């Protein structure tokens, strides 16, 4: 037996070895076979048998003569692309010369080459032909290789030119070139390239698909349009005058008479307008530059504004004086020529003639003037500069001019005032009503006959108020017109901290919390109050309070409108009653404060322009762009260009109008002048500056630059640009979209925390008139919509299903456009939105959000990329549509297409259903509520940090958030947080997340997977294949675009050394990149650009700042990272490794805590992350959570349940505390949410140098420029010195003075009406120290225009 065993032992061992290593043997055989194939293929070809030779030669013998074949073999040897040479040169075209030099063998030899299978020449030809075929295959494989050099490309081009150029001489290889080419074409090189290229085939294909699927924004999205040129049929002066008067919307009856235009030329320094001249014309600069100055005592002049060519010098308030026949003159305002220029002067006295002919036609222009006064002048000076009482004329100065009128009828009534019986509070109510009628008629400029008295008496009622009673609160919308009959009222304003009143987040909260109410003006008997509110339809600008026991006559808005229809001439006296209370200071400032109207696409300013003014957005929307990249967007209430004005730097970005916008322009000279006149303005501006610098959504100066995927399309992430929205247009993508139910659902979700108005064509036609929808631009409709936008914080415009005038109007009015589509259907080739964009430019620059509606039973969305690749969308949202939205679909199916496009009856039914059943049951966790919070800037973001197995605590925190009713609108994470966040974004159900996360943690606990994934540690210990398989099995091929909730994850790009924020692409790949710990897993090659990505924890382990930049107002950050020990051993300035080793080996001592090389490298890698985390902890927007997970290690994946329960316990306590301490009511229940008002936009301003500190900017803001005042005519007008006139450094110091520089002229007959007060010249002071001004406005000026006398000492 031993003999047989020893005989067959090797055989038994061989069989056993083969049986146990079948795969290894097969792999070895395949490798050897492949190598043998390439070697034999390169050296000998496939075969040398006669049959193969015959088969190879037969096609040639059939297709061409023997003589032709004899020429082909040498030709193949001389060119690089022999097949093409055979095809082109083998049968040369007629008339094409050929210079190919070949040696023709004898014919007998050619026959032998064809018929003999053993001929050596034919065998060599075959080998060369096959070798060249392999070369061609190799070139086709590597032609797209990124490693190709320009030399290779040029060689290919030369070869193509040689081959395809008919009749050209084939290029012969040089000796060196041939050897070099042979080395690159070896079989081993081919195999190497096949392996290398094949391993990247998936990622290359993915990259090409991603580049093709995303649509770039249109060119108009970033670049402003050019200004319109002057029509050739119009003279420049006519064009400029009409352009500057366009904002008034003058009646069609008024026509411009070119004969009234006077054009004059001026030299530099010449006066165009001097103090004392009449203010009854508009001045327009045809060419050159003009400067506006304020003239003071002793001939001092102060530059406050520069007017370029095309600009105008005119105050709209002066127009009311002219219409009221009040002589208006310039007090101290002067206009001078900075350069040699031409100026057009147009007298506006023709306005008065047109007004007297048709007062009703001038109601709209008068309303525009009063609205401009409120929106531009009063709002800017009060809310942004902190002025209140300075804006109104003081009582002792105003007493003389109350009830002043210019009409002859009213003058007659004023002359009889002293003979009238005064109002007696003890009279009966009927006698009081008679007096009230008469006084009200006089205030309206009417004759108090029986008819007028009867009409007024039916529309007014009398009320009595005790002292201190508040009649109307500031900001109230109660529109009434009141006349004081007895006693007096006080108009007061609260503190001017605009942002603190709205958001209560001011830098000086302690001061703003105190009630700061200041009395502005006192209103006495026979004066009107409330005209500003009733004419503009705006909330009250003042708080009206009774100073003593007061008796007033009140006319409500509807009664005033009815009386106005009968007597349209009363509109002007009511407007002038507002004008008479304005202080001389405000009337002077009005000349320098510009009302800028910017149409869609036009630039407010461009990059590189001098920053000589700041802008306040009154309405509309603007976008700041830089190098085809969106920096930010501005909405109502935002301030533009303040930082650049302070730092005196050119504009860093270009700001263009997204839609028609109105702005208030404050020149730098005017800003400095106001600070000199009222130094407290400087403190207010410092406070405003501090509000911008205290914003927590500013990027930290040390933060790594973020690369968001939409940057490749020329824009930053759009979610941060949809804040501060005031108007939203909803456009259906197809006729089957339930548009009316969608707008009702959105209205329901938005109305939980602010007032919302939903407008459709049907509702507008019912409120106004169906005829307003027939015109493309109806002024009545435009004004009505503007009033609604001023009244309601948010307006939803519901578009029609077709291209109607109403649809175009909605797009023009919209700050953002929501394109609603059915998610389960493929996008149509021609949608309504695309048709609208092709037909006109309305809304082409507006951010468009794609809304995909899905049935409630949908598990996960899919196919989102098909929608995104057809049209450009700045963002997308997935919404589960409740079943109630689809209950009207059957009715739509029964209707014709025309009936579907105008669903009037169905709309009424839908609205009625929602009003009865839906509007009273808010649901904060619905998808519509999530969309509403994102649109209003109140999104709640959840950030999950990295920490390995400790990330199981995130699952517990998610369950705690759900139990406490805290919704999550955006999810982001790093490392393990990206995986848990991806699970929640894919399925927003904490139970499902827990199940799937537990399964993945269980797989990560397997030791065999780790052993099978081990490899030679060149880049990492593991290949990453098993880890990739586990994540792929979890997410499959899900894309980030197909997640229910907006999601991002963080990775570290070691190719460019920056942080990457991923918001699109394959979910598993970027989760894998975010979890790739260096040394354990190799970096992931980005599927889009091939960059190497590692764990995001190296740069930002808790990306709360990224979440804030994406638009989240409240960020809940859960940190599960390890805490590094800081109590280390102090070993001095040198360290011996042997000493440390001996200390650790000593069993009787405690080893010192000294970092080894691996720990030092790890801490260096996390330096920026640790610093970022400290900033996040201190941020006011961040709610920082840290479960007690210190006992657990990074790789404790088997302890999932234990860690999760710990996170759940901690999360319940933390969430309860968050809701308790949430003063803003963002995280609380519905009742708390209703107390919250929408956040106003206070985003960061365009980038300025970070070297400029807040202290430097505050000093620049509050600094009063010290300049040397000069006498008139001595001002330097050289624009080459320190820039154009009117820029920084060209202003003049203003001494305290009586600021009587308005165009205000009062009737002398109105002085001391009741005879109960006496005035002297010294008492007629409004602002500043005593001066020589006399009473009555115009009396203080010399009628001849001479220099005013100096003030008395």
Swiss-Prot record:
Polar residues: compositionally biased ranges: 91-123
Annotated segments matching region Disordered: 49-188, 199-218, 1230-1249, 1274-1293, 1305-1353
MF-aspect GO terms: lysophospholipase activity
EC id: 3.1.1.-
Short motif (DGA/G): ranges: 1095-1097
Protein name: Patatin-like phospholipase domain-containing protein ZK370.4
Active site: 975, 1095
Enzyme class: hydrolase
Family: Belongs to the NTE family.
Major localisation: membrane
Native organism: Caenorhabditis elegans
Membrane topology recorded in Swiss-Prot or TrEMBL: Single-pass membrane protein
Transmembrane segments annotated in the record for this chain: 12-32
Every PNPLA domain range: 942-1108
InterPro entries in alphabetical order: Acyl_Trfase/lysoPLipase (IPR016035), cNMP-bd_dom (IPR000595), cNMP-bd_dom_sf (IPR018490), LysoPLipase_patatin_CS (IPR001423), NTE (IPR050301), NTE1_P-loop_dom (IPR056556), PNPLA_dom (IPR002641), RmlC-like_jellyroll (IPR014710)
């Amino acid at each position: 037996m031993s003999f047989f065993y020893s005989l067959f032992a090797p055989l038994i061992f061989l069989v056993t070895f083969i049986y146990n290593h079948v795969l290894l043997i097969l792999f070895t055989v395949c490798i050897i076979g492949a190598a043998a194939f390439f070697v034999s293929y390169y050296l000998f070809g496939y075969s040398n048998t006669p049959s193969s030779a015959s088969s190879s030669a037969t096609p040639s013998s059939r297709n061409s003569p023997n003589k032709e074949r004899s020429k082909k073999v040498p030709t193949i040897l001389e060119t690089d692309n022999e097949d093409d040479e055979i095809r082109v040169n083998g049968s040369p075209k007629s008339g094409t010369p050929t210079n190919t030099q070949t040696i023709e063998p004898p014919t007998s030899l050619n026959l032998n080459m064809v018929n003999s299978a053993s001929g050596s020449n034919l065998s060599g030809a075959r080998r060369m032909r096959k070798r060249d075929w392999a070369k061609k295959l190799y070139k086709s494989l590597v032609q797209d290789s990124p490693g190709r050099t320009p030399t290779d490309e040029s060689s290919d081009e030369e070869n193509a030119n040689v081959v395809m150029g008919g009749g050209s001489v084939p290029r012969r290889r040089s000796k060196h070139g041939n050897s070099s080419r042979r080395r690159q074409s070896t079989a081993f090189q081919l195999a190497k390239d096949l392996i290398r290229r094949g391993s990247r085939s998936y990622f290359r294909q993915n990259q090409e698909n991603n580049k093709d699927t995303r649509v770039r924004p249109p060119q108009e999205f970033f670049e402003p349009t050019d200004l319109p040129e002057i029509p050739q049929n119009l003279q420049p002066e006519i064009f400029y005058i009409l352009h500057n008067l366009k904002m008034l919307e003058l009646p069609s009856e008024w026509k411009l008479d070119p004969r009234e235009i006077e054009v004059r030329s001026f030299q530099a320094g010449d006066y165009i307008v001097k103090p004392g001249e009449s203010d009854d014309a508009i001045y327009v600069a045809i060419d050159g530059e003009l400067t506006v100055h304020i003239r003071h005592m002793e001939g001092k002049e102060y530059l406050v504004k520069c007017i370029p060519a095309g600009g105008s010098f005119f105050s709209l308030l002066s127009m009311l004086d002219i219409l009221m026949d009040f002589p208006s003159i310039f007090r101290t305002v002067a206009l001078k020529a900075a350069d040699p220029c031409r100026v057009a002067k147009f007298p506006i006295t023709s306005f008065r003639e047109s007004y007297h002919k048709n007062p009703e036609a001038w109601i709209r222009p008068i309303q525009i003037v009063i609205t401009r006064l409120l929106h531009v002048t009063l709002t800017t000076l009060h809310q942004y500069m902190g002025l209140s009482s300075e804006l109104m004329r003081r009582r002792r100065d105003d007493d003389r001019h109350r009830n002043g009128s210019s009409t002859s009828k009213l003058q007659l009534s004023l002359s009889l005032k002293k003979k009238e019986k005064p109002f007696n509070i003890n009279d009966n109510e009927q006698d009081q009503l008679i007096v009230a009628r008469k006084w009200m008629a006089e205030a309206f400029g009417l004759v108090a006959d029986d008819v007028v008295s009867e009409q007024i008496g039916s529309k007014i009622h009398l009320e009595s108020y005790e002292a201190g009673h508040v009649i109307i609160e500031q900001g109230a919308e109660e529109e009434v017109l009141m006349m004081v009959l007895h006693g007096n009222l006080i108009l007061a304003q609260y503190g001017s901290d605009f942002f603190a009143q709205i958001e209560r987040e001011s830098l000086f909260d302690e001061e703003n919390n105190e009630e700061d109410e200041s009395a502005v003006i006192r209103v006495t008997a026979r004066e009107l109050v409330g005209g500003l509110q009733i004419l503009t339809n705006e909330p009250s600008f003042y708080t009206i309070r009774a100073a003593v026991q007061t008796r007033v006559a009140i006319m409500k808005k509807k009664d005033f409108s009815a009386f106005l229809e009968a007597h349209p001439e009363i509109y002007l006296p009511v407007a002038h009653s507002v004008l008479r209370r304005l202080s001389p200071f405000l009337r002077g400032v009005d000349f320098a404060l510009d009302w800028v109207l910017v149409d869609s696409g036009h630039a407010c300013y461009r990059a590189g322009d001098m920053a000589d003014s700041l802008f306040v957005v009154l309405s509309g929307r603007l976008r700041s762009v830089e190098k085809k990249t969106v920096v930010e967007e501005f909405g109502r209430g935002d301030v533009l260009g303040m930082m650049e004005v302070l730092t005196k730097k050119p504009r860093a970005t270009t700001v263009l109008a997204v839609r028609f916008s109105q702005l208030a322009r404050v020149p730098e000279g005017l800003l400095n002048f106001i600070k000199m006149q009222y130094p407290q303005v400087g403190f207010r501006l410092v406070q405003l500056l501090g509000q911008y610098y205290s914003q927590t959504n500013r990027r930290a100066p040390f933060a790594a630059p973020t690369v968001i995927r939409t940057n490749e399309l020329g824009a930053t992430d759009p979610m941060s640009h949809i804040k501060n929205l005031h108007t939203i247009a909803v456009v259906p993508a197809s006729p089957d979209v339930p548009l009316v139910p969608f707008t009702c659902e959105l209205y329901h979700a938005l109305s939980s925390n602010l007032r919302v108005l939903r407008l459709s064509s049907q509702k507008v036609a019912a409120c106004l008139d169906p005829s307003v929808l027939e015109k493309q631009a109806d002024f009545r409709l435009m004004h009505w919509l503007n009033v609604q936008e001023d009244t309601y914080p948010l307006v939803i415009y519901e578009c029609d299903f077709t291209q109607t005038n109403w649809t175009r109007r909605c797009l023009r009015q919209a700050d953002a456009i929501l394109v609603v589509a059915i998610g389960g259907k493929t996008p149509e080739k021609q949608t309504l939105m695309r048709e609208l964009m092709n037909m006109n430019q309305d809304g082409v620059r507006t951010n468009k959000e794609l809304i995909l509606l899905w049935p409630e039973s949908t598990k996960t969305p899919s196919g989102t990329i098909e929608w995104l690749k057809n049209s450009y969308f700045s963002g997308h949202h997935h919404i589960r549509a409740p079943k109630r939205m689809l209950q009207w679909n059957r009715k739509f199916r029964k209707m014709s297409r025309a009936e579907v496009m105008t669903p009037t009856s169905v709309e009424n039914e839908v609205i009625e259903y929602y009003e009865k059943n839906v509007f009273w049951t808010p649901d904060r966790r619905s998808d519509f509520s999530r969309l509403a919070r994102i649109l209003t800037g109140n999104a709640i973001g959840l950030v999950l940090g990295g920490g390995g197995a400790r990330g199981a605590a995130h699952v517990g925190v998610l369950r705690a958030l759900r139990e406490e009713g805290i919704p999550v609108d955006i999810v982001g994470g790093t490392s393990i947080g990206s995986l848990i966040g991806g699970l929640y974004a894919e399925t927003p159900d904490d139970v499902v997340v827990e199940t799937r996360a537990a399964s993945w943690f269980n797989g990560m606990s397997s030791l065999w997977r780790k052993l099978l994934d081990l490899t030679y540690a060149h880049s990492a210990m593991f290949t990453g294949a098993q880890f990739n398989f586990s994540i792929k099995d979890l997410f499959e091929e899900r894309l980030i675009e197909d997640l229910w909730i907006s999601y991002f994850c963080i990775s570290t790009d070691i190719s460019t050394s920056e942080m990457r924020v991923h918001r699109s692409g394959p979910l598993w790949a970027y989760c894998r990149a975010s979890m790739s710990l260096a040394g354990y897993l190799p970096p992931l090659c980005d599927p889009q650009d091939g960059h190497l990505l590692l764990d995001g924890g190296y740069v930002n382990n808790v990306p709360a700042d990224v979440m804030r930049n994406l638009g989240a107002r409240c960020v809940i950050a859960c940190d599960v990272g390890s805490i590094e020990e800081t109590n280390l051993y102090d070993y001095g300035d040198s360290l011996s490794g042997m000493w440390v080793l001996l200390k650790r080996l000593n069993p009787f001592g405690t080893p010192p805590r000294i970092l080894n090389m691996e720990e030092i490298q790890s801490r260096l890698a996390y330096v920026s992350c640790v610093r970022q985390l400290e900033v996040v902890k201190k941020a006011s927007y961040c709610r920082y959570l840290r479960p007690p997970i210190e006992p657990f290690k990074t790789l404790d994946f088997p302890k999932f349940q234990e860690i999760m329960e710990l996170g759940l316990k901690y999360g319940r306590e933390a969430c309860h505390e968050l809701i308790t301490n949430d003063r803003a009511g963002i995280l609380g229940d519905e009742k708390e949410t209703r107390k919250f008002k929408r956040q106003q936009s206070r985003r960061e301003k365009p980038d300025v140098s970070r070297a400029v500190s807040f202290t430097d900017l505050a000093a620049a803001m509050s600094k009063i420029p010290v300049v040397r005042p000069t006498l008139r005519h001595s001002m330097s007008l050289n624009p080459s010195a320190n820039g154009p006139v009117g820029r920084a450094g060209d202003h003049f110091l203003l001494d305290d003075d009586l600021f009587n520089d308005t165009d205000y002229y009062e009737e002398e007959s109105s002085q001391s009406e009741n005879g109960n007060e006496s005035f002297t010249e010294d008492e007629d002071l409004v602002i500043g120290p005593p001066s020589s001004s006399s009473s009555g406005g115009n009396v203080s000026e010399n009628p001849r225009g001479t220099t005013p006398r100096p003030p008395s000492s």
